């Protein structure tokens, strides 16, 4: 009798495990897997890590990008301790400055990043310090706006920029650190060319899909497609195309702008993107209600079967 019951149990188990999965269920499982490949983060100031890490942990975030004013051994120690305590992991250190940055089309080319000659020496020093700080804390990458990279590869500013970035890339590579370009000032194909020409193997992209729109360099989806080979992280931000020839397009809350987030997420699922999406809203730095709402919106897009 026991043997008969056992055989019946085995037969039912075989039947259950061989029930075909419907197309809808397959799509649901596929979307859950896609969402599982994504980590969500926010941008925080790293000068007071105990408080900042606790706040974003309470909001349900496990990752962040850091902005730090001074790179000191004491702060590095506090950051390491906070990472362990709160299990919040910095994905990049945003390393900018020193000097003025003009976020427009008139003064921007002469003030942003390493393309302008005037600020190079001090900013290279700052990047070296940022890379060393990443190594000390355990942050895998440093990232920055590197400037309005010239379209013409024969332009002397382009040639100088490539030489500088090769040195920075090698400096970071020797310390096990990656360097991320923030999209914005250059066309996607120019950025792709620059990374190829630099060629140190540790250069990647933090793709700010709104910047592609706000600088008028590309629509968000096409820009992402061109750069996807090197995209390790994404800034979830929205904006409008520029209409004033001297000023960037306006930033707006997601999904009120010209970034096509349903198409962006569909493409990320298509290419099986694995990486971080950092929610950024520069109009309200600590608008946690907006950040949580946006995270839910993006998660819903990942789980959508449409």
Sequence positions of predicted segments:
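Active-site acidic/histidine proton-transfer and metal-coordination neighborhood
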Residues: 104-204
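Hydrophobic faces of well-ordered beta-strands that scaffold small-molecule active sites
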Residues: 38-44, 64-66, 90-95, 142-144, ...
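Conserved, mostly hydrophobic/aromatic
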Residues: 56, 64, 83, 134, ...
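Acidic-and-aromatic substrate-binding clefts and catalytic sites of carbohydrate-active enzymes
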Residues: 43-51, 66-78, 149-153, 184-190, ...
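Bacterial N-terminal signal peptides that target proteins for export
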Residues: 1-8
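N-terminal pre-domain/capping segments
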Residues: 22-129, 135, 173, 200, ...
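Bacterial N-terminal signal peptides
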Residues: 8-17
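Acidic/histidine-rich catalytic cores of soluble enzymes
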Residues: 63, 162-258
